[in-house]
UniProtKB/Swiss-Prot annotation:
Positions with a binding annotation for Mg(2+): 61, 125
HAMAP family registered for this protein in UniProt: COD
Classification via InterPro entries: COD_ChbG_bac, Glyco_hydro/deAcase_b/a-brl, YdjC-like
Location, primary (coarse class): cytoplasm
Annotated localization: Cytoplasm
Organism: Escherichia coli O6:K15:H31 (strain 536 / UPEC)
Protein name per Swiss-Prot or TrEMBL: Chitooligosaccharide deacetylase
Family statement drawn from the similarity comment of this UniProt entry: Belongs to the YdjC deacetylase family. ChbG subfamily.
SUPFAM superfamilies: Glycoside hydrolase/deacetylase
Lineage: Bacteria, Pseudomonadati, Pseudomonadota, Gammaproteobacteria, Enterobacterales
Described function: Involved in the degradation of chitin. ChbG is essential for growth on the acetylated chitooligosaccharides chitobiose and chitotriose but is dispensable for growth on cellobiose and chitosan dimer, the deacetylated form of chitobiose. Deacetylation of chitobiose-6-P and chitotriose-6-P is necessary for both the activation of the chb promoter by the regulatory protein ChbR and the hydrolysis of phosphorylated beta-glucosides by the phospho-beta-glucosidase ChbF.
Enzyme Commission identifier(s): 3.5.1.105
Keyword Cytoplasm: yes
């Protein structure tokens, strides 16, 4: 049985080094899809690069934890900036859901303005769209707009609560991450998905060249290792041997 594999590189638009890494991993590797931060400092550079790489599917990386929002968000920003304190607000059940709904719509419209088309799918920076309070907002929005959504089904209590017309891959993995990045780890992710009987899988990745912005990230040099693995010719062959076809959210 042929299975669909979506290799999605997060953080398009974060920095020039990140952008170049994603393009390299698409052009000479197995990355088929990326998601863009429309408030990223290098988003214009990402748009420019994407014009020369039409095979790269581009979704939207919804941002609520970094940089400046596109709308006024007094309930989520500090000194006008987003940050990781969103976790505390979520634990206290104090998230400004109306502000988040408006920001999602604004980032979506900004994406269309930048790239000239709808995103292939939605996901989010630091997986905040999987917060129980935020997920229904994003799922409803994606279904209404007719675009797919990254879904990590482990935190979900009931798949039956999803909108009937919402598209996603059957499986999602964030396991290709950390200090032990290797080809063996990537293939283990595929084998685990196969054992679960999933016919489609998204694997998250973050290939990049290191620049000053990436150097400031807690997740820095493993991005280079990811790039090496994802552009390995042997990995592409091993994926095909396991019965996977590379694709994007256009295919779900």
């Amino acid at each position: 049985m042929e299975r669909l594999l979506i290799v999605n590189a997060d953080d398009f638009g974060l920095s020039k080094g990140q952008n170049y890494g994603i393009i390299e991993a698409c052009r000479n590797g197995i990355v088929t899809s990326t998601t863009a931060l429309v408030n990223g400092q290098a988003i214009d550079h990402a748009v420019q690069l994407s014009r020369d790489e039409p095979s790269l599917a581009i979704g939207m990386h919804f941002v609520l934890t970094m940089g400046k929002p596109l709308t006024v968000m007094p309930g989520l920003t500090r000194d006008g900036v987003l940050g990781k304190w969103i976790w505390q607000l979520a634990e206290e059940d104090a998230l400004p859901l109306e502000e988040i709904t408006q920001e999602l719509a604004s980032q979506y419209l900004r994406f269309i303005e930048l790239f000239g088309r709808k995103p292939t799918h939605l996901d989010s920076h630091h997986h905040v769209h999987m917060f129980p309070q935020i997920f229904p907002i994003v799922a409803k929005f994606a279904a209404e707009e007719g675009i797919a959504l990254r879904i990590d089904r482990q935190p979900l209590s009931n798949d039956g609560d999803l909108p009937a017309n919402l598209r996603s891959s059957q499986g999602f993995s964030s396991a290709f991450y950390g200090e032990e990045i290797s080809e063996a780890l990537f293939l283990q992710v595929l084998d685990d998905s196969s054992h679960r009987g999933e016919r489609s899988l998204e694997v998250m990745c973050h290939p990049a060249f290191v620049d000053n912005t990436i150097r400031q990230s807690a997740y820095c040099f493993p991005r280079l290792t990811e790039l090496d693995v994802l552009t390995s010719a042997s990995l592409k062959y091993a994926i095909a041997e396991r019965g996977y076809r590379l694709g994007s959210y256009h295919d779900v």
